[in-house]
Amino acid sequence: DAFAYAPKTPGLRNFMNEPDTWDTLERIRQMADSHGLTLLPEIHDPYAAGTYEKVARKGYMTYDLFLPGLVIDAIENHDGTRLMRWAEELREKNPRTVNMPGCHDGIPMLDLKGLLSDTEIEKLIALIVSRGGMIKNLHGAKNVYYQVNCTYFSALGADERKMLLARAIQL
């Protein structure tokens, strides 16, 4: 979780300080490998930054933090265009992601930047908040959306049909 914040260097930002971030992750991977474990790094960064692709090029799988919001967007707007565009990119780029619509972090929002417009993300946030979600802003920043904490079922309006559709899309 949040491996990109691990290495700290005075004067640098606290996120993805290269090469220190990769060196730290590699040391952890070596320890994991010695015990037969596989690492699954989690990183929240806007889609447009391409960080998930860097993680894949380094040989790691990573969480697909784009799927949860894109599925809600597609279901609620009755339009799968953006979801399909993203799915095509996944097929082409093969970034080795693991799908997980529901998790302990709620619904990632920061990651959607570059897939949805700011206005679309703000609408999605408002919808999920109206269903009981709570906004969590990026650490150290004000009014910079990070995620909306709630269950995926709640984010879908506690609608069993929408939840079944979301899980079918996940598969």
Each language-model region and where it sits:
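Active-site and adjacent substrate-binding regions of carbohydrate-active enzymes
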Residues: 1-171
